Curated annotation (Swiss-Prot):
This is DNA ligase. Pfam families: BRCT, DNA_ligase_aden, DNA_ligase_OB, DNA_ligase_ZBD, HHH_2, HHH_5. GO terms for molecular function: DNA binding; DNA ligase (NAD+) activity; metal ion binding. DNA ligase that catalyzes the formation of phosphodiester linkages between 5'-phosphoryl and 3'-hydroxyl groups in double-stranded DNA using NAD as a coenzyme and as the energy source for the reaction. It is essential for DNA replication and repair of damaged DNA. Its EC number is 6.5.1.2. One of its GO terms (biological process) is DNA repair. Residues 596-677 form the BRCT domain. It comes from Pseudoalteromonas atlantica (strain T6c / ATCC BAA-1087).
Length: 677
């Protein structure tokens, strides 16, 4: 009987029982007790914890009601990047996706794909250590997200402790946080009763709920989490499955919820059959989806296929056909972007399309206006391409009013009145004003200070706009001349914020050549291209002096990008900006040339597993790479050596089975010493 147990024993008993009920309800979709019995147990649990606060544990079901509010979200760096997916919009895209895979793997046989609905919510990473939830984070930019642990702990179907005993000691689960349609309706009814603004759609409601600083608010929102993949995995107690679908089944055994519509199919044809089936079920599902995700099911194939800069080669999101509605074009305004691009923006009669109200849509350029034959006053068809980006795809010619007006493209910049030029072969017209143009200046400054560029903490978009409007900043180097006194007088600043900003600007002066190149905003030079340029040329001076042939010798730099880089460094005002930044103290460490084929471990594949005591995992990986080795995350027949730390797990077993060379940490350190000696 329960009264024969101590409070601690009874509490453990109740927690285990409630966790089992949650598993039956959320994972197996098979509730075994009435709500009244569940509620009775929760009340008893709360009574015991209130009377014995020392017995309250972090993984107690009571912790799902939320704790103290936060002042801000901390940043979290993903140990394994959370990449996005490439998209397919039609059957040809899917067939091409399968062909790319077969060509790369050099196979002709059918490929097994794991198929699941693409949930329309917010991507989240949840880290478990020794079975206990220790951290949750948003995707962010894929490398750095926000710590939302306290909020995720309140989600009803997220286990605070994993079931069973055979899970890895560190296990990162990735999935989507969503809100059901019924939950969304209930939430909006409550919002309206409180006199608050209702949410536009379930996705926005879910995202807004997760980013509440007060977890009690999140706890009151009807959120659910569904797992779709693994991220970081360390110290496996039992081997993970050799397919994506079997690994998801393991997650389910450990208490993590999965989509009920998961299937494994053979080849692109069956994938398309699954896509059409889910499309027909779409309106019957309890939650919003915007497509289907297909992943190569075989993990070894995934590893061989690898990744491109932003997405895996072995997965694709097949989006549903865009949703369309009719609206009226009220006006066209012309916006100026960071690179001077003049973009016509359609102002529309607000129209509800695919879950959101659309009042603006891009018309891209003059060529698109001509193609559509569009006039102000026309009735137009709006499409949300990929359920995201509003586009005007056609006009309804027989509804054109008598007073419809032609759209007149400006001859001079609508912001600074500089001349507009349109180069031969380009569809985009551009303002020639450069940093003289306030619109370009604002966007260029935002780019310069952004996280992927110089990463100036506290220098947000609104403050940059204020600084440009006040003419305190006309060039990037002006940031480093800002004084505390004038900054303190700006809206929402104050002396403390001004001091922090000046210190952050000083800190940002130490950067890398790649980040500096990216910060300059050279057309079509993203992070990866900037990194390739830096590693190839080693110095800024070498890049400045490079001709077109030399630039095209850089990995991933073609004719067009080479021309943009070449032109940028031939413009005198760009060189003046660079000179001013260097004079202000912006600097970076010298880059050593990587002669990979001459390095001692060139061409060798290493795998790290288990716990290292002298060097941490990242340091060991960096050291191996500096010696020319490729460091892989999994053991295969192509592996040359496995470095096995403590509690090595299944990778060690697999390496031994394959006859792969195995060394311990001491062996690795001795090797490093020999190679450097």
């Amino acid at each position: 009987m329960s009264n024969a147990l101590s409070p601690a024993q009874r509490l453990t008993q109740i927690i285990n029982t409630i966790n089992e009920y949650n598993y039956q309800y959320y994972v197996q979709d098979n509730p075994s007790v009435p709500d009244a019995e569940y509620d009775r147990l929760m009340r008893e649990l709360l009574d015991i914890e209130n009377n014995h606060p020392d017995l309250r544990s972090p993984d107690s079901p009571s912790q799902k009601v939320g704790g103290a509010a936060l002042s801000a979200f901390e940043q979290v760096e993903h140990e394994v990047p959370m990449l996005s997916l490439d998209n397919a919009f039609d059957e040809d895209d899917m067939q091409a996706f399968e062909k790319r895979i077969k060509d790369r793997l050099k196979i002709s046989s059918e490929i097994s794909f794991s198929c699941e609905p693409k949930l329309d919510g917010l991507a989240v990473s949840i880290l478990y250590e020794n079975g206990q939830l220790v951290r949750a984070a948003t995707r962010g930019d894929g490398r750095v997200g926000e710590n939302i642990t306290t909020n995720v702990r309140t989600i009803a179907n997220v286990p605070l402790r994993l079931r069973g005993e055979n899970f890895p000691s560190r296990l990162e689960v990735r999935g989507e946080v969503i809100m059901t349609r019924a939950g969304f309706v209930t939430l909006n009814e409550a919002q309206i009763k409180k006199g608050k603004k209702p949410f536009v759609n379930p996705r926005n409601a879910a995202a807004g709920s997760l980013r509440q600083l007060d977890p009690k608010i999140t706890a009151a929102r009807p959120l659910l989490f569904y797992s779709y993949s693994l991220g970081l995995v360390e110290n496996e107690q039992q081997p993970l499955g050799e397919t994506h679908s079997s690994r998801l089944a393991q997650l389910s055994e450990w208490g993590l919820p999965l989509s009920k519509e998961l299937e494994v199919t053979q080849g692109a044809t069956q994938c398309l059959t699954y896509f059409h089936k889910i499309g027909e079920l779409r309106s019957q599902l309890s939650y919003d989806i915007d497509g289907v995700v297909f992943k190569v099911d075989n993990i070894a194939m995934q590893q061989e296929l690898g990744f491109v800069a932003r997405a895996p080669r072995w997965a694709i999101a097949h989006k549903f056909p865009a949703q369309e509605e009719m609206s009226t074009l009220l006006d066209v305004e012309f916006q100026v972007g960071r690179t001077g691009a003049i973009t016509p923006v359609a102002r529309l009669e607000p129209t509800f399309v695919g879950g959101v109200t659309v009042s603006n849509a891009t018309l891209h350029n003059q060529d698109e206006i001509n193609r559509l034959g569009i006039k102000i006053g026309d009735s137009v068809i709006i499409r949300r391409a990929g359920d995201v980006i509003p586009q005007i795809v056609a006009i309804v010619a027989d509804k054109r009013p008598d007073d419809a007006k032609d759209i007149v493209f400006p001859e001079s910049c609508p912001v600074c009145d500089s001349a507009i030029e349109k180069l031969e072969g380009e569809a985009v017209a551009r303002c020639t004003g450069g940093l003289y143009c306030k619109a370009q200046r604002k966007e260029a400054m935002k780019h310069f200070a952004s996280r992927k560029a110089l990463d100036v903490d506290g220098l947000g978009d609104k403050l940059i706009e204020q600084l440009v409007d006040a003419e305190m900043v006309k060039s990037p180097a002006d940031f480093f001349a800002l004084d505390i006194a004038p900054l303190s007088s700006m809206e929402r600043m104050g002396e403390k914020s001004a001091v922090n900003l000046v210190n952050a600007l000083e800190k940002s002066k130490k950067t890398t050549l790649a980040k500096f190149l990216y910060s300059l905003g050279i057309r079509e030079v993203g992070e990866a291209t900037a990194q390739n340029l830096a590693q190839h040329f080693l110095t800024l001076e070498a890049i400045e002096q490079a001709d077109l042939d030399a630039l095209q010798a850089v990995s991933d730099v073609g004719v067009i990008v080479a021309q943009h880089v070449f032109n940028f460094f031939k413009e005198e005002h760009n060189l003046e900006v660079i000179s001013a930044l260097l004079e202000a103290g912006v600097h970076w460490p010298k880059i050593e040339k990587l002669a990979l084929d001459e390095l001692p471990l060139a061409g060798q594949v290493y795998v790290l597993t288990g716990t290292l005591n002298v060097m941490d995992r990242n340091s060991a990986k960096a050291k191996l790479q500096s010696l020319g080795a490729k460091v892989s995350g999994s053991v295969s027949a192509k592996t040359d050596c496995l470095v096995a730390g403590e509690k090595a797990g299944s990778k060690l077993t697999k390496a031994q089975d394959l006859g792969v060379k195995v060394m311990n940490e001491d062996d690795m350190l001795a090797m490093f010493a020999d190679l450097e000696g």
